[in-house]
């Protein structure tokens, strides 16, 4: 009888912890590394593909073509 009560209480506590954790994690990403790179790319201003660029200024989102001096993505 005591063991049954302990198991029921443990299951209820674990279920409550799962529900609380699920509510807190809404809108966040599962992997922290992906979240940090996403935040970095959203917070930096970069030029869209086809915009003029300089290969040394690193202002394109991906890369700058040194021959055409245009961003490509």
From Swiss-Prot:
Keywords: Amidation, Calcium channel impairing toxin, Disulfide bond, Hydroxylation, Ion channel impairing toxin, Knottin, Neurotoxin, Presynaptic neurotoxin, Secreted, Signal, Toxin, Voltage-gated calcium channel impairing toxin. This is Omega-conotoxin GVIA. The keyword Metal-binding does not apply. Residues 1-22 form the signal peptide. Has a very low activity on Cav2.1 (it displaces [125I]MVIIC with an IC(50)=1.05 uM). The modification Tyrosine amide is found at residue 72. InterPro entries: Conotoxin, Conotoxin_omega-typ_CS. Expressed by the venom duct. Disulfide bonds join 46-61, 53-64, 60-71. The modification 4-hydroxyproline is found at residues 49, 55, 66. Changing residue 58 to A: Strong decrease in activity. Its main location: secreted. Changing residue 58 to F: Decrease in affinity. Residues 23-45 form a propeptide. Pfam families: Conotoxin. The presence of a 'disulfide through disulfide knot' structurally defines this protein as a knottin. The cysteine framework is VI/VII (C-C-CC-C-C). One of its GO terms (molecular function) is calcium channel regulator activity. It comes from Conus geographus. SUPFAM superfamilies: omega toxin-like (SSF57059). Belongs to the conotoxin O1 superfamily. GO terms for cellular component: extracellular region; host cell presynaptic membrane. It is found in: Secreted.
